[in-house]
Amino acid sequence: MKFVLLFGVLLVTLFSYSSAEMLDDFDQADEDELLSLIEKEEARKDCIPKHYECTSNKHGCCRGHLFKYKCQCTTVVTQSGEETERCFCGTPPHHKAAELVVGFGKKIFG
């Protein structure tokens, strides 16, 4: 009888210890995931939205539905006759085509 009682107490102790460690691991994973999401959100706030100027920061465009927007540049002639480069964040044609195909695929297959 003493052996069964001792074995039961040992089993309950081991079970509570292992479940506490698993909960600590889950809590740590949740904290890491939360920090990762916060960092991504901060990066998203600093990015340049679609159709906005990105001349000074060509790699700072935000993400679109599937792809990150690309900084597209054109040469503009000012009224004084100077040529300057102006850039904006936009979706390249091959990304537009891929998004169109994915959209049709979602409509067909559900």
Curated annotation (Swiss-Prot):
The keyword Cell inner membrane does not apply. Expressed by the venom gland. Residues 21-44 form a propeptide. The keyword Secreted applies. It comes from Lycosa singoriensis. PROSITE patterns: SPIDER_CSTX. One of its GO terms (cellular component) is extracellular region. The presence of a 'disulfide through disulfide knot' structurally defines this protein as a knottin. This is U1-lycotoxin-Ls1hh. It is found in: Secreted. Its main location: secreted.
